[in-house]
Each structure stands twice: as structure tokens, then as C-alpha cells.
Amino acid sequence: MALLPILSYPDPRLRTIATPVKEVTAEIKTLITDMIETMYDAQGIGLAASQVDHHIQLIVMDLSEDKDSPRVFINPKVTPLVEEKQPYEEGCLSVPDVYDKVERPNKVRIEALDENGNKIDEEVEGLLAVCIQHEMDHLNGVIFVDYLSRLKQTRARDKVRKVLKIREKQGEQVAEKEPQPANS
């Protein structure tokens, strides 16, 4: 098991569209284990593979109080079951210390595979529905701050930079930024 570096906003790799998982291999199962460990270590409730620079359609989450009931969703598809959207305050491991309200459908159908390749087809609501939609956004290159005003996006970017500088000074593992092309 290994802790994986979590990409931070505005890293352009977070905008990469994830590709479907073709088969649940030993490598995928190892990634799932590492993602769950990383999510718990970061005190999160959900993590998409895109956030740890693996651009495949894979989500892990655990909404239990004891953090002992991880769920895995491979190649997830979500269908809203209600038209009305409700605001929920969201945060994100890729946008540390930034929280804001995002409106999403409160009830959805989730179709996916679990870590053993078994089909999942459930109707979910509340926090689980919101969490699944939030993590699915990551698989599509969308970050929750994209739903906010430009001013709030700028503030979020500035806050993340400050948080990362503090974390680096404290010796925490921070994902390296993608190399920038050299100026010619």
C-alpha cells in the first residue's frame, strides 16, 4: 500500500478526461487500495483516480463515520432521478481548504462495476448522490470550483497556492506540478 500524491487545482492534469477501465486487473486493485489509503490519510470522503494522476474511470468513497466501509465505482454512469437541484456545501481534496455551495440533483441512479467487476445499479440520494456526482465530475475534467463565479475561482486558486506552500514547508508530500514547456 502506498500514499499517492493528490493533484491540486489549478493543475492542468485535473482537466484530463478519464478513459474507461477495460478489465479489473491486479494493477487496478492495487490502485484501488492505494486510493482508499490516500483518501483516508487526507481525511476525505471520496477520491477519483484523476486526482492522483491516473486518468481512468475509477472512484473510491467512504461516507461511514468509522471509515470502514469503502465503496468502489468503476466506469460509473449517473442518471439524475429528479429535476430539482439542491445546494450542498462541497469541498475537495484537490482544492484544499476551499468550500462553497454547489447545486446538484439530490437523487440519482448509479450504474458501475465494483472492485470485483460485479455490476452496481442503485438509486442513491443525499450526500452519497452529491459525492458520486462530484467525483464523476473529476472523471470528466470538471472541478467543483468550475460551478462558482470567476471571482470565487480566483480566490480558490490563491488560497490553494498558500495552503500548498505551507504544506511544503511542513514537509508534507505535495504533487509536483506538470512540467511547463520551455520558452523558445
Swiss-Prot record:
Cofactor(s) in the UniProt record: Fe(2+)
Alphabetically ordered keywords of this record: Hydrolase, Iron, Metal-binding, Protein biosynthesis
A GO biological process held by the record: co-translational protein modification
Reactions performed catalytically: N-terminal N-formyl-L-methionyl-[peptide] + H2O = N-terminal L-methionyl-[peptide] + formate
Name of one Pfam family that matches: Pep_deformylase
Active site, per annotation: 135
Record keyword Metal-binding present: yes
Annotated EC: 3.5.1.88
Coiled coil location: none
First-tier enzyme category under EC: hydrolase
InterPro entries: Peptide_deformylase (IPR023635), Peptide_deformylase_sf (IPR036821)
Cofactor: binding comment: Binds 1 Fe(2+) ion.
Binding-site residues, Fe cation: 92, 134, 138
SUPFAM superfamilies in the cross-refs: Peptide deformylase
MF-aspect GO terms: metal ion binding; peptide deformylase activity
NCBIfam families given in the database record: pept_deformyl (TIGR00079), PRK00150.1-3 (NF001159)
Family, as annotated: Belongs to the polypeptide deformylase family.
Known function: Removes the formyl group from the N-terminal Met of newly synthesized proteins. Requires at least a dipeptide for an efficient rate of reaction. N-terminal L-methionine is a prerequisite for activity but the enzyme has broad specificity at other positions.
Record-given protein name: Peptide deformylase
Organism encoding this protein: Psychrobacter cryohalolentis (strain ATCC BAA-1226 / DSM 17306 / VKM B-2378 / K5)
Classification of source organism: Bacteria, Pseudomonadati, Pseudomonadota, Gammaproteobacteria, Moraxellales
